[in-house]
Amino acid sequence: MTQTTSQTESKWFAPEEFESIRQRLPILYVDAIPVRVDGQGMITSVGLLLRVTGQGKISRALVSGRVLYGERVRTALLRHIEKDLGPLALPRVPPAPAPFTIAEYFP
């Protein structure tokens, strides 16, 4: 069993173990672009996160994160939206979200 830092004991790996796994297996992540829409469904605002890079510069980022083993994509989206935007974000995510696009990242 690995050490954990959260309540999801069996779903987290130690950093060294995770790095080894990333080199051998594909790992599912979700990226989301939060938007605000008006009464007619037209996009009025697009949200990006501001993050500080390792060099101390400000950069923009998407809401994103790993999908846990056995977790539904919708649940992962809601978890990462709440983590990045706070519990009052109140996102409207469809019951069965379909990907807009699929991208492949290489560490």
Predicted regions and their residues:
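Residue-level signal for pocket-adjacent positions within structured domains
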Residues: T8, F13-E16, Q55-K57, L62, ...
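Generic structural "secondary-structure junction" signal
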Residues: V30, L62-S64, Y69, E104-P107
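Residues in well-ordered beta-strands of folded domains
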Residues: I33, L50, A103
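Active-site segment of metal-dependent pyrophosphate-handling enzymes
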Residues: D84-P107
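Short, flexible active-site-adjacent loop segments at beta-strand->alpha-helix junctions, enriched
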Residues: D38, V52, F106
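Conserved Nudix-box catalytic region and its N-terminal flanking loop in Nudix hydrolases
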Residues: G41-L90
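Acidic, metal-coordinating catalytic segment for phosphate/diphosphate chemistry
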Residues: T2-Q40
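A generic structural signal for short beta-strands and their flanking turns/coil linkers
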Residues: L28-V30, G56-I58, A96-A98
